[in-house]
Each structure stands twice: as C-alpha cells, then as structure tokens.
Amino acid sequence: LGDWLEEVYECTTDPSTSYHRVPLHATGVAIVKEGQYRGVWKLGKHRGLYKALVQTGGPITIYRDSNLDDIADYVDEDTGYFGINLHRAGRSSLMDNTKDFSAGCICIRSPLDYARFIRLCELQDENGKGSKYSFTLVREK
C-alpha cells in the first residue's frame, strides 16, 4: 500500500454569513456533521473554476440551520449528496472568515496549505494509489 501520510490543515466548515442569512436550500444552510466519511470525494473542479475535492462517492451527513440567525444550530440532520466540496478559502492570502466562500463546504484557510493538499491528492492519483478521498471531521467544542 505504501507509506501513510498524516497532515492537519487549518480549515472550517462554517458557512458564510451571507449563506446563513439567505440559504441556497429551503430547509437551511448546510453544516457538515462531525464523523468519518470514507471515499466521498474525487478530484474535480469547485464550481467549475479550480481543482478541489468534489462530493461524488458517497453521502455526507449535515445539519440544516434554518432560523437565519448566523449561529450554527446542530439539531436537524440530513444525509445525502449536497455538493459538499473541499476547497480553498482565499486565492492568495490567509482568510480570517469565510466571507462569501462557503455555503457549507470545507474550506482550507491557507492558499499554500491548499496547494500542497491538492498536489498530494494529484500524486496519489498519478501513482495509482486510488482516486477516492476520505476525511474525518472533529468539531472543536
């Protein structure tokens, strides 16, 4: 199988304020539930614009926050294919918030970290080590 590599990246699952106030879905903004999601992503394009991990391989469980108060409520769960991608926050600088970057996706804060992460995914694909990606989300309390 090869050597395992473990890396940790500063990221967020917090949707942007704009999506909290005006969600894309009638039942509320998506917030990824903590847990392990195996094989749910493949390399693709986020909104057709740049390389990202896109949800194609399995369902993800989310919370739906529908009260429009910009505070995450971890109550109403839904599981399925929601287009939860892993993408960057800013293109060229560290971001202190998600601005309008996220409707519930996972965003890596540092563009340099993101570039490294995507390159590791590309290398895995190129070396025949697999084209599906898993992740484990631990929520800070």
For the regions a protein language model found, what residue spans apply to each?
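A conserved hydrophobic position in a structured secondary element of the catalytic/binding core
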Residues: 108-109
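Cell wall/extracellular polymer interaction/catalysis modules
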Residues: 1-99, 113-133, 138-141
